Amino acid sequence: MVKATKAEKKIAYDTKLCQLIDEYTQILVVAADNVGSTQLQNIRKGLRGDSVVLMGKNTMMKRSVRIHSENTGNTAILNLLPLLQGNVGLIFTKGDLKEVSEEVAKYKVGAPARVGLVAPIDVVVQPGNTGLDPSQTSFFQVLNIPTKINKGTVEIITPVELIKQGDKVGSSEAALLAKLGIRPFSYGLVVQSVYDNGSVFSPEVLDLTEDQLVEKFASGISMVTSLALAVSYPTLAAAPHMFINAYKNALAIAVATEYTFPQAEKVKEYLKDPSKFAVASVAAVSADAGGGAPAAAKVEEKEESDEEDYGGDFGLFDEE
């Protein structure tokens, strides 16, 4: 079988990536540092059905994206270009983005601290018995780790931050962690960005609940409304408040001048004679309380009638 030339491989890659862009509208951009071929194969199997994992050189991916944009006029896909930095791959999916992201995270595997590797996290060695014999104390002394001999083995006395995040792993740290059987790092595909129908956002957005989204949306509307009111710029959210403020201003002008309009007449009338406020409130209270008065009168009248009838009965007995 004749091997494909480099040019033919590029054309095949362009064709495949363009087909995937046509078929899928959701793409996860994932970092693939320290991910082995076996691990990547397991991820592909786990996502099989509604997702496709595509790896490749950044230059090839960028070239294919530009070709697709030129051929189809899809300029939104160009938003992917700034995201193709470093050792990254693309996961094309038709599934729920959060579920796919969670599935990818399941395939992280533990890894030893190799010399020269940049630590993705802080590495802290906890106190306790190491199981190492006293002849191994030199490893601890080089790293200034306080120890003691307990029952013929080396015991670490206090927690020690062996490697800080971002630092390179040294030979002494790597050797000690290997002797302790500690695999401090875990590697897998890490979602860096999410592309969805032309929009690009952080993967943290996938963790937001519906209540959090509503809260953020309400907060945004409140901020926009406040800004619109401050600069007197009409928006749908600010319009009701602007109308109310305008009405208050017009009312204040009408009260202070001879200018008037129907809604201002009643206000002016009350301001000229404040006692009308009291009359109106008393009338309202009387109207509320008056409903129970007839019923009370009827009850009282009925009680008086009963007493009269009862007294008449005694009169009949007296005559006999």
From Swiss-Prot:
Keywords attached to this entry: Phosphoprotein, Ribonucleoprotein, Ribosomal protein
Biased composition (Acidic residues): 302-320
CDD domains: Ribosomal_P0_L10e
Subunit structure: P0 forms a pentameric complex by interaction with dimers of P1 and P2.
Region of interest (Disordered), residue spans: 289-320
Highest taxon above the source species: Eukaryota
Sites bearing Phosphotyrosine, chain numbering: Y310
GO biological process assignments: response to cadmium ion; response to zinc ion; ribosome biogenesis
Top-level taxonomy: Eukaryota, Viridiplantae, Streptophyta, Embryophyta, Tracheophyta
UniProt organism field: Arabidopsis thaliana (Mouse-ear cress)
Residue positions, PTM Phosphoserine: S305
Gene Ontology CC annotations of this record: cytosol; cytosolic ribosome; nucleolus; nucleus; plasmodesma; ribonucleoprotein complex
Listed name of the protein: Large ribosomal subunit protein uL10y
UniProt entry tagged with the keyword Phosphoprotein: yes
Gene Ontology molecular function: copper ion binding; mRNA binding; structural constituent of ribosome
Family: Belongs to the universal ribosomal protein uL10 family.
Task of the protein: Ribosomal protein P0 is the functional equivalent of E.coli protein L10.
